[in-house]
Amino acid sequence: MAEGEDAGWWRSWLQQSYQAVKEKSTEALEFMKRDLAEFTQVVQHDTACTIAATASVVKDRLARTEASGATEKVRKGISDFLGVISDTFAPSPDKTIDCDVITLMATPTGTTEPYDSAKARLYSLQSDPATYCNEPDGPAELLEAWLSRFSLEEKKGEIAELLATSPSIRALYTKMVPAAVSHSEFWQRYFYKVHRLEQDEVRREALKQRAEQSIHQEEPGWEEDEEEFLGMSPLPCANVKFPQAAEKASVSAALEGSQPSVHKGPSGESWAILPPELAPAEGSPSESSESVSLVTQIANPASVPVVQLQTGVQPSGNRDLSQRLLEATSEEQSPLPKPPEPGHPSAAAQEPAVCSEQTAVTGPKEVESKAQGRTETLKEEGPTDLRVFELNSDSGKSTPSNNGKKGSSTDISEDWEKDFDLDMTEEEVQLALSKVEVSGELEDEEWEDWE
């Protein structure tokens, strides 16, 4: 049993191996046959092209050589023989190299001249027997329409010229007419195919021009882009304004009590430098901080040619006025000061502290006397060019500062129960400001009345 099974296994293995070898051998043979066929076809094609080209060149050279007598007859016979060989071995147009590559070609008269692709296709068409034997390709309607317009009588001159100048057409005409085709069919097929060839050339030329135009349009116009770039106006950098810088400058100028100052330019014209409208100060307020309205001054725009920001040193009289007003307001609003929380001083508390240090030297009585005198003087002189003066203090909480100085104010009081509103008319404010600039002294009674 075991020996029978082993023999069966070896037999099946040998059969499988033989079958595999047979299949591989068959594939290899087919591959070799295909390669040999392709190689033979290429060799035949190249040989035919070489023979045709050589025959044409030899024929051309023999035609150019001048001879006489028997030598001329021999050379003429050889030339005719080579011409027949060239026509026989010349491949058809669909099996030749692209006709666009041909730049030199022998003419029917025996000369060589540079020809374009259209003339090369025309000569190939003339030497092809299928041009005259086979029916034209394409729809029959086109052929019938063309035949209705074609007249063989009008082409007699051209036919005679072709028979005289083209040996290939003359040889084919002699062989085919009237054995294979009639005279009219021969020339109708020839002229129709020439007509189709001309249409193809026109179509090819149109496509070529369209491609050239599209390539030309896709090229970037660097000159136009450069002109557009040069024609662009630059950004008006001189008119650029920075709102954040203006707000910071206006806040610092208002806190210092800035007043419009008059300067003289190089040309001698006087112009005023005014702070812009006071914007809300950016800072880190404390937990119980509230808004504090400061003094804003707006001059007459018609009398000021140039308005600029100024953050430098301001007159001391104007700064003292704002500081004294803030100090008086804070003293009235904070009868019961409360110690601030350590480590959280606010920006609004530090600025009034500086003001309170200066007012502590002068004293409240001097402030009151100056305010009274200023009010009386301005009532007589009338309003000046200052138009708006506001002092709204709805939250002015003052407490002793961390260093214990008198009059320092903070905004962290929590038990403030009373709001202090100071309402003044526009005329009273203008009179008070003008009086401070003129006299600089106020009385106690007028200060109390003014409050």
Swiss-Prot record:
Residues 275-295 have a biased composition (Low complexity). Residues 412-424 have a biased composition (Acidic residues). GO terms for cellular component: cytoplasm. Residues 365-388 have a biased composition (Basic and acidic residues). Residues 309-320, 392-411 have a biased composition (Polar residues). Residues 146-198 form the BSD domain. Gene3D superfamilies: BSD domain. InterPro entries: BSD_dom, BSD_dom_sf, BSD_domain-containing. Residues 252-296, 309-424 are annotated as: Disordered. PANTHER family: BSD DOMAIN-CONTAINING PROTEIN 1, SYNAPSE-ASSOCIATED PROTEIN. This is BSD domain-containing protein 1. It comes from Gallus gallus (Chicken).
